[in-house]
């Protein structure tokens, strides 16, 4: 077993622009794009900007040309689960409705006002990649940075010509409960919740048990961001991830959280920025896991370098 080092989160002294080549597959767009890059490319005919904020926020002002692709279209309330992965046909309909195809350059942006809102864009990006869209990017700093920099805004409700989209799905993005149960002890599990939820000191009301999946390492999603909600540098991200998950880029890894909203950020960064090739996210997360009487839960913190 690879020895994992304790990590500490270092404050960032300066804002760093993260424009990184994709580490996992050929791309025509960086996995994280700056507000300056996006402004310079607004006229690109292949560009599709997905604004995942609430419609009322979108109507108050959005990036010119952006369509309102509310987060709720990408993560359903189903069978008591707050953020279930939609069926493939539903994903196809949503992607096609927004005029996206396999040649599109898709930039996803949203509100960064709260931690959970700031994580929504990555869930949408991972779902698009699950459907076979490779050229997906996150806007560094989201709408908050765009507005702060006084870049142009539009109040026009944008509509794109829809397309008959049929996804090219693979099992590379999402894990289910049975996959984790059948591979406990073989996987590297990354619990991306804040420490007090990992340890069992706190829980969401929708989670029936406190604690975490046995053997999981705690790597909060909030650690990926600077105070201004831009992403940390590639080197800083690698330091955090390697402390918890090791540096074997081919290791089998699953990220999870409470309801499947926080964990996609690390899954996206690990595969698209840091070069990890076998990372899945568990959309059912602790909400589903803790409801299964046969799925073990522990409060033992010994497995987490962040807690030592």
Where are the model-predicted features located?
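Bacterial N-terminal signal peptides that target proteins for export
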Residues: 2-11
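Bacterial N-terminal signal peptides
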Residues: 10-21
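Sec/Tat signal peptide C-region and signal peptidase I cleavage site
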Residues: 22-26
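Positively charged, proline/Ser/Thr-rich regional signature most characteristic
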Residues: 27-103, 111, 181-250
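Active-site neighborhoods of enzymes that stabilize oxyanions during catalysis
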Residues: 27-28, 40, 144-214, 294-308
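Extended hydrophobic/aromatic segments used for targeting, binding, or gating
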Residues: 67, 235, 274-306
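Thiolate-centered catalytic microenvironments shared by cysteine-dependent enzyme domains
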Residues: 85-179, 202, 211, 258, ...
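Extracellular low-complexity, Gly/Ser/Thr-rich intrinsically disordered linkers
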Residues: 233-276
């Amino acid at each position: 077993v690879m020895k994992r080092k304790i990590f500490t989160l270092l404050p960032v002294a300066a804002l760093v622009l993260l424009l990184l080549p994709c580490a996992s597959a050929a791309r025509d767009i960086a996995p994280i794009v700056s507000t300056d890059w996006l402004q310079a490319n607004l006229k690109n005919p292949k560009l599709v900007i997905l604004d995942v904020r609430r419609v009322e926020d979108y109507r108050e002002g959005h990036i010119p040309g952006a369509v309102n692709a509310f987060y709720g279209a990408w993560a359903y309330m189903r069978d008591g689960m707050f953020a279930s992965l939609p069926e493939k046909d539903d994903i196809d309909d949503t992607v096609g409705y927004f005029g996206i195809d396999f040649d599109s350059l898709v930039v996803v942006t949203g509100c960064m006002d709260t931690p959970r809102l700031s994580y929504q864009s990555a869930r949408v990006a991972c779902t698009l990649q699950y459907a076979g869209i490779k050229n997906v990017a996150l806007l560094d700093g989201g709408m908050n940075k765009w507005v702060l920099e006084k870049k142009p805004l539009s109040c026009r409700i944008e509509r794109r010509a829809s397309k008959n989209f049929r996804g090219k799905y693979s099992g590379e993005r999402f894990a289910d409960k049975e996959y984790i149960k059948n591979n406990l002890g073989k996987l590297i599990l990354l619990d991306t919740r804040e420490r007090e939820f990992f340890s069992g000191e706190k829980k969401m009301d929708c989670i029936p048990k406190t604690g975490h999946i046995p053997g999981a390492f705690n790597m909060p999603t909030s650690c990926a961001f600077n105070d201004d909600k831009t992403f940390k540098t590639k080197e800083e991200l690698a330091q955090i991830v390697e402390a918890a998950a090791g540096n074997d880029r081919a290791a089998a890894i699953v990220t999870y959280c409470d309801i499947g909203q926080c964990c996609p950020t690390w899954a996206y960064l690990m595969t698209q920025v840091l070069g990890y090739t076998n990372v899945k996210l568990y959309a059912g997360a602790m909400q589903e896991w803790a409801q299964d009487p046969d799925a073990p839960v522990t409060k033992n913190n010994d497995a987490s370098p962040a807690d030592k």
